[in-house]
Swiss-Prot record:
<comment type="subunit">
    <text>Interacts with UvrB in an incision complex.</text>
</comment>
<dbReference type="Pfam" id="PF08459">
    <property type="entry name" value="UvrC_RNaseH_dom"/>
</dbReference>
<dbReference type="InterPro" id="IPR001943">
    <property type="entry name" value="UVR_dom"/>
</dbReference>
<protein>
    <recommendedName>
        <fullName>UvrABC system protein C</fullName>
    </recommendedName>
</protein>
<dbReference type="GO" id="GO:0005737">
    <property type="term" value="C:cytoplasm"/>
</dbReference>
<dbReference type="InterPro" id="IPR035901">
    <property type="entry name" value="GIY-YIG_endonuc_sf"/>
</dbReference>
<dbReference type="InterPro" id="IPR010994">
    <property type="entry name" value="RuvA_2-like"/>
</dbReference>
<dbReference type="GO" id="GO:0003677">
    <property type="term" value="F:DNA binding"/>
</dbReference>
<dbReference type="Pfam" id="PF01541">
    <property type="entry name" value="GIY-YIG"/>
</dbReference>
<dbReference type="InterPro" id="IPR038476">
    <property type="entry name" value="UvrC_RNase_H_dom_sf"/>
</dbReference>
<comment type="similarity">
    <text>Belongs to the UvrC family.</text>
</comment>
<dbReference type="InterPro" id="IPR003583">
    <property type="entry name" value="Hlx-hairpin-Hlx_DNA-bd_motif"/>
</dbReference>
<dbReference type="Pfam" id="PF14520">
    <property type="entry name" value="HHH_5"/>
</dbReference>
<dbReference type="GO" id="GO:0009432">
    <property type="term" value="P:SOS response"/>
</dbReference>
<keyword id="KW-0742">SOS response</keyword>
<keyword id="KW-0267">Excision nuclease</keyword>
<dbReference type="Pfam" id="PF02151">
    <property type="entry name" value="UVR"/>
</dbReference>
Length: 609
């Protein structure tokens, strides 16, 4: 316990009412938020002699002071606790990092509506279907929709610029409303059917199409009847592949597995009785946290996150029973202003879905533990090979990417003992050097990375340089300069490519002694080095390609007299890209806002010349 904090004096002032407490460290940071029916009783438990919980011991040792907020009821305390956890993100609380907005399928409000992927604020008018658990689920659904319903998926600018059908029409994946290949009535009918399908009413869609097929056959419109028949067969095939519940309602089914410090909540999103999607969540759980706290924290943080656009069903089925379940139901219902039910003992279809969710959660934890153990073993082997006296907690790797000196980008990727730490990745756009000078590029990147480094900052234990002795010397010189007044500096290691750039033939060079050595091709430590090197290369080349494309788009158009940033943007947006601008006729260029007939001719001549 902190010597500054007088627990006995503090406890004499604490009420026995319900409420929330916030524990602070000496820096004034909130390190834990908790709630209690009886604050005095709960807080007293932290300061008993012989605490047997390691987490509690560590927490108490860092307490500098505690703030208390009284509430009218335990339900109010639950809600306030959740608000404080979201606000302060305390290190000793269970934290669910679920800050990405969820993707939707948008059916736009247009004369000829389009289906599109959407993430973010819902500003465009139309109907939004979702949310989907991830972007892959949306793209997969859109791909399926293209096969089932000939509705356009192009953006409005592309739609307006068409003078003839695109490839999607030839593939029977769009009915080409842009050039009048389908009547408005027929297109609207397909839009209605697509909307019903996205709502999960596929049997209603099939029944409608069967009636239309029979009507077309009676009227001897056999080609039309055949198209309806093919559409019905495709829909039935999709319906057969989906697991369907007799219960046609909406619910979330949550399977939970917690082992070796890793908690997984696997959610099945059941909509209209079908599995709409699934997703695994891995909240950050401090060691020896009580399972009830893990469950309570997840439910509150997941369903009461106002920053995430999420459709919340009335019913949630979860694999673990826990205390405060009814209080939790009441708290969420009050916060959402709607009925919210949590069930743990279920039968029939619900039980089947729950078993599936638990199986997925268990497998996910096993996979993570296997990966974690593999990475951990590789770190330990690397420590042994390098004869280090302290563990490696953070590694970084730098790489340079360019095309003949154009659009040079440096990457810095970060690994910890669990593998890639992508939130810490950085790219550096290299400026003001001789094109193709990799040494100067590396010097600029390393300088920018450590320019303002301080003790206690994010200092890597190992810094890999993807390159030979020359680049390593440049990096070592900068590190020596930047860390001269600090107690700790990274160990630099150059990773020189082997003969023919074949994996397993790399030469490793120590930055301080310039000693070179190689590892066996099947060495797990070498595999770790290859992993971080390859990840650095991937991250650098992706950044370089994006920068190069942006530069080429800009320079190609803005080199034309009269074309500035605004007109360049209008051309690219209206026609869909640089290649489309290059292939456009004068008549098509004139349709772009701000482009006169004379300017269109100038652009056409410049790009074709």
């Amino acid at each position: 316990m902190s010597s500054v904090f007088n627990a006995q004096s503090f406890l004499r002032t604490v009420s026995s009412s319900a409420g929330v407490y916030r524990m602070y460290d000496v820096k004034g940071d909130v390190i834990y938020v908790g709630k209690a029916k009886d604050l005095k009783k709960r807080l007293s438990s932290y300061f008993r002699k012989n605490l047997d919980n390691v987490k509690t011991q560590a927490l108490v040792s860092h307490i500098h002071h505690i703030d208390v907020t009284l509430t009218h009821s335990e339900t109010d305390a639950l809600l306030l606790e959740n608000d404080y956890i979201k606000q302060y993100m305390p290190k000793y609380n269970v934290l669910l990092r679920d800050d990405k907005s969820y993707p939707y399928i948008l059916l736009s409000q247009h004369e000829h509506p389009r289906l599109a992927y959407h993430r973010g604020p819902q500003r465009e008018k139309g109907h939004y279907f979702g949310p989907y658990p991830n972007g892959g689920a949306v793209r997969e659904s859109l791909h399926l929709m293209q096969k089932l319903f000939p509705i356009r998926q192009c953006d409005d600018l592309y739609y307006k610029s068409r003078s003839r059908p695109c490839l999607q029409y030839q593939l029977s994946r769009c009915s080409a409303p842009c050039v009048g290949k389908v009547s408005n009535a027929d297109y609207d009918e397909q839009v209605k059917l697509a909307s019903l399908f996205l709502k999960g009413k596929d049997q209603q869609v099939i029944s409608t199409l069967v009636a239309k097929m029979e009507q077309a056959a009676q009227q001897q419109e056999y080609e039309q009847a055949a198209r309806f028949r093919d559409q019905i067969m495709a829909l039935r095939k999709v319906a057969e592949q989906q697991e369907v519940s007799n219960n046609k309602g909406d619910m979330d089914v949550i399977g939970v597995h917690y082992a070796s410090g890793i908690a997984c909540f696997h959610l099945l999103f059941i909509r209209e009785g079908k599995i709409f999607g699934s997703r695994s969540y891995y909240p950050s759980v401090p060691a020896q946290t009580d399972m009830d706290e893990v469950l309570r924290s997840f439910i509150l943080q997941f369903y009461l996150n106002a920053d995430i656009q999420r459709t919340i069903p009335k019913e949630v089925v979860i694999s673990h029973n826990f205390e405060e379940l009814h209080e939790l139901e009441a708290a969420v219902s009050i916060a959402l202003n709607k009925k919210f039910s949590i069930k743990t003992n279920v039968r029939a279809d619900r039980a089947s879905f729950l078993r599936l969710a638990v199986t997925n959660a268990t497998n996910a934890v096993i996979t993570r533990l296997s990966h974690k153990n593999t990475v951990e073993q590789r770190f330990v082997l690397l420590e042994e090979i390098l004869e280090l006296s302290t563990p490696i907690y953070r590694m970084e790797c730098f790489d340079i990417s360019h095309t003949m000196g154009e659009s040079t980008v440096a990457s810095c990727v970060v690994f910890n003992r669990e593998g890639p730490h992508k939130g810490e990745y950085r790219r550096y756009n290299i400026e003001g050097i001789t094109p193709g000078d990799d040494y100067a590029a590396m010097k600029q990147a390393i300088t920018r990375r450590f320019d303002k480094i301080e003790a206690g900052g994010k200092i890597p234990d190992i810094l890999f340089i993807d390159g030979g002795l020359g680049q390593l010397r440049i990096a070592q010189k900068i590190v020596d300069e930047k860390f001269v007044h600090l107690d700790k500096a990274p160990q630099l290691i150059g990773v020189a490519k082997g003969e023919g750039r074949k994996p397993g033939l790399e030469t490793l060079i120590l930055g301080d002694t310039e000693t070179s050595f190689s590892l066996e091709g099947d060495s797990p430590a070498l595999h770790l080095i290859q992993h971080i090197r390859d990840e650095s290369h991937r991250f650098a080349i992706t950044g370089h390609r994006n920068r190069r494309q942006k530069t080429r788009n800009t320079s190609t158009l803005e080199s034309i007299p009269g074309i500035g940033p605004k007109r360049r943007k209008a051309l690219l947006q209206h026609l869909g890209g640089l290649q489309e601008v290059k292939g456009a006729s004068v008549a098509e260029l004139v349709k772009v806002p701000g482009i006169s007939i004379e300017m269109a001719q100038t652009i056409h001549d410049a790009l074709r010349g």
